[in-house]
Amino acid sequence: MFDLDRWQEIFSTLAKNPLRTFLTAFGVGWGLFMLIVMMGAGNGLENGVTREFTNVATNSFFLWGQRSSKPYGGFGPGRQIRMTEDDYFSIREQVPDAETIAPRNQLGGFGGGNLVVRGNQSESFSIMGDYPQIMEVEGIDVLSGRFINALDIQEKRKVAIIGTRVKELLFEESEDPVGDYLMINGVYFSIVGVFGTRTDGDRGERDESRIYVPFTTFQKAFNNGNQVGWFAIKSKEGVPATVVEQEVVTLLQRLHSVDPDDRRAFGSFNLEERYNQIQGLFGGINILVWIVGIGTLVAGVIGVSNIMLVIVKERTKEIGVRRALGATPWHIISQILLESIVLTGIAGYVGLMTGLITLDGVALMAGDENSMFQHPQVDLDMVLQSLMVLIIAGAGAGLIPASRAIAVHPVEALRAD
């Protein structure tokens, strides 16, 4: 039941020594503030880093040929391993754990740019030769028209799908590129679609500066024979990409007469492995944040307990008078506990709100989509649970002072100075 006199007494007691009360409350509030800010900052950094994985399947890897480092099968070291379309068919038949296999080529090699002409406009873009299944590995969103299909591959059609950046540079805003033509290395292609990606920043702009053409058309139009620049492979659900990668490498080593112990003949980039490393890193950061935050909170709660002990000692005579006038032990205990809970609760709430406001300010300052720090947020349920735990801890912090208070004999308390 609400007792106005009791609450007035609580606030009056805390206000008797404002500096002591402020410093104690600051210790508690600072602990919750630090916990929220550190967790939000960790989440913001994690969001920024993992954003790079939103455009690709994390259970995938990329594999390409390099130079052998060991002699094997009559071949000397330093031999360039050139993968072909035959390797694609072999992987498809002999590695059942590979769900998606996408052989890829890029005009001019990896990272190469090529002059593309449309009317009086010309720019340099990346030209990719791909199969339709590349969409299962890379997060490509077709915004208008369509993507490469099986008939394009079968009939070696001269069709192209352009990125939004290509559209911006070669076409007016009001123009629809679908149905128009562009020229790549003297070969005309009909535009059948426009795509965008799910990645922001520099990487998103780079990906959207690509032009996709059918793999078989690429081979014929640019005299690429049956060579494959690299493979993009996605493993089946439940099968680690590292396992599939090893199966593919073992097969290719046999097909290309490469020493099984030669680790340099094939290069790879395993997204699943990299993603797991990053998740493990941020898992460790989160544990560290909790340890530091909880340690700071515990220090604040201990401070509350110590201050309440001091307050009880200062009020020894007052407690003796109350006991002599018939105050029950529960009345004394509840008074001390309420003072501890009020001090902890108010300090925790202020720390909580200050932390959330700070995160909002940081989010506004780091609003650049190219930033590696994105959306520093914390889970509201977790925040409220932390506040409740803090208040319960505040009650616990008042138990020792409260037990000291009721242990005082009324006669001895009345004699206290």
Describe each region flagged by the PLM.
Residues 2-5, 314, 403-417:
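Short cytosolic juxtamembrane segments of multi-pass membrane proteins
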Residues 6-11, 15, 19, 23-27, ...:
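Transmembrane alpha-helical interface segments in multi-pass membrane proteins
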Residues 11-15, 42-46, 50, 272-289, ...:
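Alpha-helical membrane-interface segments at transmembrane helix boundaries
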Residues 43-126, 130-136, 151, 168-169, ...:
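Hydrophobic, regular-secondary-structure patches
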Residues 69-77, 111-113, 200-205, 256-263, ...:
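Short helix-coil transition/hinge motifs at the ends and kinks of transmembrane helices
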Residues 128, 133-152, 156-259:
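Mid-to-C-terminal secondary-structure elements
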Residues 232-234, 241, 247-248, 259-293:
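Peri-transmembrane interface segments
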